[in-house]
Amino acid sequence: MSDEAWKQTLICESINDKIGYWEYLAVTDKRRRSRNKAQSSGAENYKKVLEEQQRIYTAGGMGYGPEMYQVISNPMRNQKRVNNIEGSKIFAAMNSGAPRIALDIQYVEEMNKRDSGELGNQMQYTISENFSAKSPFVLDFVNSPSKEFLEQWLSKSVGYYTGNYINQTILPDFSTKGIKEFYGKSANTIYISSNARDVLDGPLTADVIGICVTMGRKREALSAARRANIRAYRLPIHRYVKWKSGPQYLPFPNIMNVLREVYMNGGDWSRALHNNISKRHLVNADDDEQKKMQMLRRRAREEERRELTEAIMSATKG
């Protein structure tokens, strides 16, 4: 492990946290090695294709490649034009009356590195899919943590804010203010929480929709809503979806897609939910051989983790 990884390990308070962090490092390293292998294989394949194209070109044929024939890309498409189009859609959304989305990040700094990194990646996809939408929402980050942590989080996990030409589009703003302070007490504001008693149904009429950026394990969203004195609602998943397998958790890009579709279709939650929930959650795991194998592998990993925890605790006693 690197020096930085050892430092993070020492920061972890419990053995379970340490093991979780090591698992995160192992998964990250495996992905990196797979990516490097794919890139190496791709480079070798490209070299072979280029050699074949060079042979065709030398023989007087239509060989494509450097210093040979070239395919001309669409001259009207460039990153600046794409950024300007995305920014213009966000600007139009500011004046359309659509709900503003308040992404509450007050808990992110307290999380372990694995969870904060995962949520950062989800925020990246959330911003990307919002840009791609025909009718995007205006996104804002509220209850922003310390500047030092925020800069590191954006750089390592979220992206966008550290890229080129970010001045050409409209990215979500950051504020240390709470939701009501940021949007004003007169705004019709609601908060999404899977632990809320009330159910959100019908057309979206709120001015502001608060969404807590957490993994949802400790009822943080409901606590945040109560502290801010904002009424909390849960999505009507139980009313319209027969969730058959896996944890009932929607990633943030999916939540945003559901809200956007409901706003556009006038309140058809059933269609919006079914369009944005992975089909694997709608199939009974007992009827799916692949699910059975995944379940067995997961149980094996859990048993290995339990044995490792016991071994570490035994070795560190006394």
Swiss-Prot record:
Instruction: Tell me which family the UniProt entry assigns to this protein.
Output: Belongs to the class IV-like SAM-binding methyltransferase superfamily. TRM10 family.
**Where is it found, in Gene Ontology cellular component terms?**
mitochondrion; nucleoplasm; nucleus
Lineage at the top is: Eukaryota, Metazoa, Ecdysozoa, Nematoda, Chromadorea
Which terms does the record give in the GO molecular function aspect?
methyltransferase activity; tRNA binding
Q: Where is the SAM-dependent MTase TRM10-type domain?
A: 86-284
Q: Which PANTHER family match?
A: PROTEIN CBG09110, TRNA (GUANINE-9-) METHYLTRANSFERASE
Protein known as: Uncharacterized protein C56G2.3
The answer to whether the entry has keyword Transferase is yes
In short, the EC number is: 2.1.1.-
Q: Which organism is it from?
A: Caenorhabditis elegans
Q: Which InterPro entries match?
A: MT_TRM10-typ (IPR028564), MT_TRM10-typ_sf (IPR038459), tRNA_m1G_MeTrfase_euk (IPR007356)
Q: Which domain of life is it from?
A: Eukaryota
Tell me which UniProt keywords the record has, alphabetically.
Methyltransferase, S-adenosyl-L-methionine, Transferase
* GO term, biological process aspect, one: mitochondrial tRNA 5'-end processing
UniProt entry tagged with the keyword Ligase: no
Looking at its record, which EC class is this enzyme? Answer: transferase
